[in-house]
Amino acid sequence: MPDSIPANSVGLVTPQLMQFDEPLALACGRTLDSYQLMVETYGTLNASRTNALLICHALSGHHHAAGYHSMDERKPGWWDAYIGPGKPLDTNKFFIVSLNNIGGCHGSTGPVTPNPSTGQPWGGDFPTLRVRDWVHSQARLADALGIQKWAAVVGGSLGGMQAMRWSLEYPDRVGHCVVIASAMKLSAQNIAFNHAAREAILTDPDFHDGNFLSHSTVPKRGLSTARVIAHLTYLSDDGMGQKFGRELRSGSFEQGTEEPVEFQIESYLRYQADSFSKVFDANTYVLMTRALDYFDLAREYGDDPVEAFKQAQCKYMVISFTSDWRFSPERSREIVNALIRADRDVVYGELESDFGHDAFLIPNQPRYWDLLTSYMSQIEVAD
């Protein structure tokens, strides 16, 4: 818990649960008759409603992007290092909106919330989702908040995919699109990692086809293993070497010692997986990794990303990190090259980092801070 709230923090924040009663037709062919979104906002919406900025979260993210829910909260929101007064996403300038997407497990309608037709948690019966479903629900959220056009839509990883989809689905409602550590579609290797993670969950005896809550069980082992698989892809070899090397947590290699040896990296992964399995839902993990796999920005444009980006009207900023092998700089360059060929305005930054894919979340990176600050400061908003 903080001893006091830092001066550059958004401070204590209260999430709000927003109700939407207009049916939402999903890409899978099913419909949500109604749904709820858990939302947090930071800063003040100006009189002209031109300073609104949307944050789209990644796979394990949620609405709590900045500030504290109480003085007892141990850590601030997941992107607190970059959101707040005087920070790159400056709340003195922007009205920032962050939400937990449909299918999430932090308050929005999803597998852990009641299915209106049964009164029981949706569980494994929750509809399959696509990135465009999230974008359409976010557009409804913008309408409810009285926001006709976002000054910017910002997202990292899966959030970057949402930002790009926004620029195509609602081209006249996005001023700037900030895409960080993302891609226009997953590689076969990325799909394989997601498959391995899902298999760990789906084959856990406690999963019960996604209806584990009705069996009073939790597929903790499967979800923990899935998290370990994913977490490995978020780190880099250099980063793990610098942080953990071959240091031991317990045990010894001394001759005559039979005690099991545990490396620091093993202990770290086990701790992270155990923590994750206590706060995340297995069905949500399955839903969101499938949405990742199914995303293909150019599919409906003849598999031509140039043709896809010709639909857009906004300006773009694309950022990648050299040690990110999950969403490598090559994937970001593909986005940039397509934007250039589509004659769209784009700024690209490729940053040196040892933090792997997680770099977009890590604080205390001066070049990342400066790049974001420089771009965001140039976004014009009316008084």
From Swiss-Prot:
A Gene Ontology molecular function term of the record: homoserine O-acetyltransferase activity
Similarity field: Belongs to the AB hydrolase superfamily. MetX family.
Active site, renumbered: S157, D324, H357
Gene: metXS
Catalytic activity: L-homoserine + succinyl-CoA = O-succinyl-L-homoserine + CoA
A GO BP entry: homoserine metabolic process
Name of the protein: Homoserine O-succinyltransferase
Pathway(s) it belongs to: Amino-acid biosynthesis; L-methionine biosynthesis via de novo pathway; O-succinyl-L-homoserine from L-homoserine: step 1/1
Record's keyword terms, sorted: Acyltransferase, Amino-acid biosynthesis, Cytoplasm, Methionine biosynthesis, Transferase
Subunit structure and binding partners: Homodimer.
Site (Important for acyl-CoA specificity): R326
EC supergroup of this enzyme: transferase
